[in-house]
Amino acid sequence: MTFEEMIERSEHIVFFGGAGVSTASGIPDFRSAEGIGGERAEEVLSHDFFVNRTEEFFDFYRKNLLFPDAVPNAAHYALAKLEKRGKLKAVITQNVDGLHRKAGSNVVYELHGNVNYNYCMNCGKRHGAEYVAGSNGVPR
């Protein structure tokens, strides 16, 4: 049975993906030689680092996680098409880029959040990626 036949016969597909999906959109992954930092990224993006070194956290966030010009690629659109056909029930992603939603997928579980939805722990307001990108130091 071919992959296409498996998809056609399936009724409850769930896609679980990560950085490999968005690299074709120009977004580097975390762990490859061309990626954005491996263990360093995991340290900087931890809650402890955020609490104790907030300004450095946001500098890293702005430089390494925001890709305002990135657009969905063929994989993102193919998954959205499968959802519209009723084949794909959900996308579960480790990516934070929001490209699955931009491509038209509606049932998306973003395990590590989405850079387009930022929540201020002090005032409770929500901010888009543009707000963080346009700020210096810690967004206020």
Tell me what each language-model feature is.
Residues 1-140:
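Conserved catalytic core of sirtuin-type NAD+-dependent deacylases
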